[in-house]
Amino acid sequence: MKAVIQRVSEARVVVDGEVVGAIERGILVLLGVEKGDAERDAAWLAEKVAGLRIFEDEAGKMNLSVREVTGGILAVSQFTLAGNCAKGRRPSFDTAAPPDEGKRLYGRFVDFMRETGIPTATGIFQADMKVHLVNDGPVTFILESPKATGG
């Protein structure tokens, strides 16, 4: 499971001209679910996002989590994060989870985020979305859940 997270001063998702999810200060999470991902990946990423200290303290040091700054989460499904551009000019999405599994695990990620107590807004799975954001910094990170080891 992969996520691109961005520290934002505001973000919103628009579907068919209507705002379906919005936050002020917080983290925009673009989430890609891959084949082989499981609930443990969604739980791990949610906990990582909730605790990651990417907001500045009084001294200007990245030392505070989204929870500590009373921020929000905007979670948007993004299957293209599972795209492979290594060969040719057209991305391959062979590693992306099938839509039903992607939707289920995206939903579990949102559930896990909400269980942390952080207000969490969402986009709409498989919708054509317009994502508007003001990246604060800019601050952007790529996260990937640890792959399970056989053992």
UniProtKB/Swiss-Prot annotation:
Q: What is its EC number?
A: 3.1.1.96
Major subcellular location class: cytoplasm
The family this protein is said to belong to? Belongs to the DTD family.
Q: What class of enzyme is it?
A: hydrolase
Which Pfam families does the protein's record reference? Tyr_Deacylase
What are the alphabetically sorted keywords of the record? Cytoplasm, Hydrolase, RNA-binding, tRNA-binding
This protein's encoding gene: dtd
Compartment(s) where it occurs, according to its Swiss-Prot or TrEMBL record: Cytoplasm
Motif Gly-cisPro motif, important for rejection of L-amino acids — list its residue ranges.
Answer: 137-138
Q: Which reaction does it catalyse?
A: glycyl-tRNA(Ala) + H2O = tRNA(Ala) + glycine + H(+); a D-aminoacyl-tRNA + H2O = a tRNA + a D-alpha-amino acid + H(+)
Record note on domains: A Gly-cisPro motif from one monomer fits into the active site of the other monomer to allow specific chiral rejection of L-amino acids.
Q: Which domain of life is it from?
A: Bacteria
Quote the NCBIfam families the UniProt record gives: D-aminoacyl-tRNA deacylase
Quaternary structure note? Homodimer.
GO MF term list: D-tyrosyl-tRNA(Tyr) deacylase activity; Gly-tRNA(Ala) deacylase activity; Ser(Gly)-tRNA(Ala) hydrolase activity; tRNA binding
Which PANTHER family does this one have? D-AMINOACYL-TRNA DEACYLASE 1 (PTHR10472:SF5), D-TYROSYL-TRNA TYR DEACYLASE (PTHR10472)
Q: Which GO terms describe its cellular component?
A: cytoplasm
The protein depicted here goes by the name: D-aminoacyl-tRNA deacylase
What cystine linkages occur within this chain?
none
One of its GO biological process terms is: D-amino acid catabolic process
